[in-house]
Structures are given as C-alpha cells and as structure tokens.
Amino acid sequence: MTDQGIVKINASLRENVGTGPARAVRRNGGIPAVVYGKNRDSLSVFLSDREFLSKHRSAALSTHLIELEIGDKKEYVLMRDVQKHPVTDRIQHVDFQFIDYGTEIKIEVPLIFTNEQKCIGVKRGGVLNILHRTLSIKCLPNAILQNIEIDLSDLTAGHSIHVSDLNLPPEINVVMKEHNPAIVTISSTSMEKEGEGSQEPTAAPSSEN
C-alpha cells in the first residue's frame, strides 16, 4: 500500500489507567485509547483531540491503515471502535488493533452509490431500494479498500445489483451471511404498474347484418 492509503497519527503512552486518569487526559485535550492484538500485549495510549478529529473528519479511518507513532516506535493498526459521549458527542475512547501484514483482516467497507439521478429505473418512476450500505470483506492489510462505488445509471425497474455484479479485485473476499445477496434494487411503483396495464382494449370489429 502506498503512503496515500496510510494515515499517520501521533500517540503517547499512558502511565496510569482507569476512570480518573482517563478523565484527566480528556481535560488536557487528549483522547484515551488502547491498542490490542493477538499474541501482543495491549498498550494504553492517548491521542491529541485536535489531531485525531482532524484526521477523522478528512478520512474514513475505519477503512484506512493507520501508522501510529508512539514515541520513537511505529505500529500499523486499524481503528476498531470509537466511543462517544451520549450527550455532547465528544469522543471518549478509541480502540485500535495491531496489524500483521501476513494475516487477513475483516473490515466493513462503505458502499458509495453514484448516478442516482441518471438511473433509468428511477427516471421512469421506479423506487430505489438500498439493501446494504456496507460490505464485509476479508483481505490482507495492503489490499484494504476505502470504499466501493456502485454505478446506478443502467439499473432498470425490476432489476437488482448483487454482490457478484461488483468488479472487486481478486484479493478481496466477501464475507456475508447470505450467498450473493442483492445490494440495491429498483421496484416499480403501483402507478407505473397501473399505467402498464391501463391500455385501452382494442375494439372488436363490428359485424354487419
């Protein structure tokens, strides 16, 4: 993965853990965080509130590989959870996971739907139904997708786009409970259906006596 796909964030080790020390970190403009992983000791760290919010707004951190700089060490991690205050919405805590470059990881990738206004089915009165807004995938860390774009322009009423219709790289494995589920469909409106069946019947030829 190129540097363009990696987000760099500074962190510092926390000497004291628990509710009291965590509150002190927040009062001083920090965000408590933990880094965990298989066969690794967990690290308690804190982040700069200002830096993290800036990076969080500018990139979808949950689908970016993160280079966490902890003192003079660098750790590659994924952001796994962000806890927010229920009233103020301020970030209270962040969970990161250590990454092993040789081991596949599972992530939820957002689906971006494009050309809805050009969609044939919508222009003809159909109703767009989005069934999934994310796709669960497994891949190596250097193959992470930030998002998946789905072009709706050619979708017609009564048709769907399924997982198998997506042009995904071969190194991406889709992990879904259903086999090849539909992601988006266009359903016909009742008015459209009535319009299709409201053609005046052809008059039968009159017989002359």
Curated annotation (Swiss-Prot):
GO terms for cellular component: cytosolic large ribosomal subunit. GO terms for molecular function: 5S rRNA binding; structural constituent of ribosome. It comes from the Bacteria. Residues 199-209 have a biased composition (Polar residues). Pfam families: Ribosomal_L25p (PF01386), Ribosomal_TL5_C (PF14693). Keywords: Ribonucleoprotein, Ribosomal protein, RNA-binding, rRNA-binding. GO terms for biological process: translation. Residues 188-209 are annotated as: Disordered. Belongs to the bacterial ribosomal protein bL25 family. CTC subfamily. This is one of the proteins that binds to the 5S RNA in the ribosome where it forms part of the central protuberance. PANTHER family: RIBOSOMAL PROTEIN L25/GLN-TRNA SYNTHETASE, ANTI-CODON-BINDING DOMAIN-CONTAINING PROTEIN, RIBOSOMAL PROTEIN L25_GLN-TRNA SYNTHETASE, ANTI-CODON-BINDING DOMAIN-CONTAINING PROTEIN. Part of the 50S ribosomal subunit; part of the 5S rRNA/L5/L18/L25 subcomplex. Contacts the 5S rRNA. Binds to the 5S rRNA independently of L5 and L18. This is Large ribosomal subunit protein bL25. It comes from Ehrlichia canis (strain Jake). The lineage of its organism: Bacteria, Pseudomonadati, Pseudomonadota, Alphaproteobacteria, Rickettsiales.
